[in-house]
Regions:
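Extended catalytic core of nucleotide-activated donor transferases of GT-like folds
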Residues: 35-173, 183-188
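Residues that mark the start of a beta-strand
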Residues: 55-60, 174, 197-199, 225, ...
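Active-site regions of enzymes building and remodeling cell-envelope glycoconjugates
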Residues: 83-85, 153-157, 172-176, 238-251, ...
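Catalytic binding pocket for nucleotide-activated donors in carbohydrate/polymer assembly enzymes
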Residues: 52-64, 70-90, 257-375
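Helix-enriched interaction subdomains in cytosolic or periplasmic regions
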Residues: 1-38, 150-152, 161-170, 174-176
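Conserved catalytic-core segment of nucleotide-activated headgroup transferases in glycan assembly
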Residues: 192-265, 271, 275
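Acidic, amphipathic alpha-helical patches
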Residues: 95, 121, 146, 253-256, ...
Length: 375
């Protein structure tokens, strides 16, 4: 039986769609592979020459809370690469007794809000002739508490530049601004499956300024492939619009790096310094400095849109190795733009990765800390 001319097979459109889907997937996979290869090259060539190890012993007291896991890991690794010997302790240990036995050249404490290391132990160590330093990760949000803590130490390092004068005003003599950084060997770009691939990703708790932002752009986000990870997002007025995209959990640093690596855009929105429902900042110290997440996102070669803080330009150049936003409407406009400009987006992310590996690692920060104390 002869086939009629002009008859169209019912399977042809499906085959065409399948071929187009295969081609798009192939091109996207090839682009991802190319990006991954360039990132691996950057990790290898951007790292500066390691500084000589100092012939000193450091006792490091960890913060040991889930939000501080990547900080503890990065600081400990950097110390081990920078000094002769490192002894690590928990804030719940009898650190003063441990220090008496270990006799370190320096006791360094990462003091976390809500689970602070006992200042009585700091006083015991100082009375025994030991040199002490504290690195404060929650400034300026809990400055009421940290003001009482800081005066017990020989050296105070704060991630918020505006807190330096506050600590000096209350009698701390040796106070320095020292931002956090990242460990690129631990927090880095990885190849991921579809589970971690999204147009837009945000990782962090729903502080009220973030709630206001996300409520304003909820309709836009609901039309995109979005992932939001963190506590308290049920506070959203438009929670139902985004509920299926929200995972209300704490995410490990390893899992977080996978979500950063798989996202086209990561939003980084700092918390507010005047949120009285979460903060203890009665001096109203403004927040001008950047959060650790800034460096962690960049170290994953992820493109980030970050709210523009005064200190940001000391670390990255907007439009070159990072992108910024000023308002919810500006954020939506830039999300739209960069979601449709793949190569420009990835090029900015790779420049950010290079600068991070070259300038903003924990090894870099620890070298500065040790230089301040020991010269």
């Amino acid at each position: 039986m002869r086939r009629r001319k002009g008859r169209i097979s019912k399977t042809a459109p499906l085959r065409d769609e399948g071929a187009a889907g295969w081609e798009n997937g192939y091109l996207e996979g090839r682009s991802d592979g190319y990006h991954y290869g360039l990132c691996e090259s950057i990790y290898a060539r951007a790292a500066p020459e390691a500084a000589p190890s100092r012939n000193i012993k450091v006792l490091y007291v960890k913060a040991e809370g889930s939000p501080y896991a990547s900080l503890d890991q990065g600081i400990e690794e950097a110390l081990r690469a920078s000094v002769r010997e490192v002894v690590v302790a928990s804030p719940n240990d009898d650190v003063a007794q441990l220090a008496e036995a270990a006799n370190p050249d320096l006791v360094l404490v990462l003091d976390a809000a809500g689970c602070s290391f006992k200042t009585e132990q700091v006083d015991r160590m100082r009375d025994g002739g030991l040199l002490t330093a504290v690195w404060l990760p929650d400034d300026p949000y809990h400055s009421d508490a940290t003001a009482d803590i800081a005066r017990h130490y020989d050296y105070v390092f704060t991630i918020e530049a505006n807190c330096v004068s506050m600590y000096r005003d209350i009698g701390c003599c040796r106070v320095f601004h020292l931002p956090f950084g990242v460990n690129p060997g631990f927090t880095r770009h990885v190849r991921v499956d579809e589970t971690y691939r999204h147009d837009i990703c945000f990782v962090g708790s729903a502080f009220w300024n973030r709630v206001a932002y996300f409520d304003e752009i909820a309709d836009y986000l609901a039309a995109k492939r979005v992932k939001i990870i963190g506590y308290w997002w049920e506070r959203l007025r438009h929670y139902e619009k985004l509920a299926s995209r929200i995972e209300g959990v704490w995410m490990s640093p390893e899992e977080t790096a996978k979500y950063y690596s798989g996202a086209k855009i990561v939003i980084n929105l700092h918390r507010s310094a005047d949120d009285k429902s979460h903060n203890s900042n009665s001096r109203n110290v403004p927040a001008h400095s950047v959060n650790p997440r800034l460096f962690e996102i960049a170290s994953c070669a992820a493109f980030q849109l970050v709210d523009n803080r005064p200190e940001l330009s000391q670390f990255y150049t907007p439009g070159v190795d990072i992108a910024t936003f000023e308002s919810p409407s500006d954020l939506v406009g830039k999300l739209d733009y960069y979601l449709t400009h793949d190569e420009e987006r990835r090029e900015i992310a790779r420049r950010g990765l290079y600068r991070t590996v070259n300038e903003h690692t924990y090894r870099n920060r620890i070298q500065r800390l040790l230089s301040v104390i020991f010269g």
